[in-house]
Amino acid sequence: MKITPKNILRHELIGLEACVVKSKNPSQVGICGLILDETYKTIVIGVPGGPKKRIFKAQVVLRIKLPDGKELLVDGAFLVGRPEERLKRRVMLW
């Protein structure tokens, strides 16, 4: 399935480029790289030339670059959960 802005919340995030735009932890703002792993509450971002960074989803706003080149901002609170569980969840966007 092609990743689009409409289905990003229901899709696997591993392999996408992401940057932390806003965070409750100021030291995490600006972390950019590929998403290497995803757990229920965290994502692991591989920083080029640096260590892997584990980030709590609920505490950040991410700028995610889609394979077609589009970039979108995603509140990490909507990403909390495993990808297979996010498929079942209904998201009300007002």
From Swiss-Prot:
Transmembrane segments: none annotated. Its EC number is 3.1.26.5. It is found in: Cytoplasm. GO terms for biological process: tRNA 5'-leader removal. Disulfide bonds: none annotated. It comes from the Archaea. It is an enzyme of class 3 (hydrolase). SUPFAM superfamilies: Rof/RNase P subunit-like. The keyword Magnesium does not apply. Keywords: Cytoplasm, Endonuclease, Hydrolase, Nuclease, tRNA processing. InterPro entries: RNase_P/MRP_Rpp29_sf (IPR036980), RNP1 (IPR023538), Rof/RNase_P-like (IPR023534), Rpp29/RNP1 (IPR002730). GO terms for cellular component: cytoplasm; ribonuclease P complex. It catalyses: Endonucleolytic cleavage of RNA, removing 5'-extranucleotides from tRNA precursor. GO terms for molecular function: ribonuclease P activity; RNA binding. Belongs to the eukaryotic/archaeal RNase P protein component 1 family. Part of ribonuclease P, a protein complex that generates mature tRNA molecules by cleaving their 5'-ends. Consists of a catalytic RNA component and at least 4-5 protein subunits. This is Ribonuclease P protein component 1. The lineage of its organism: Archaea, Thermoproteota, Thermoprotei, Thermofilales, Thermofilaceae.
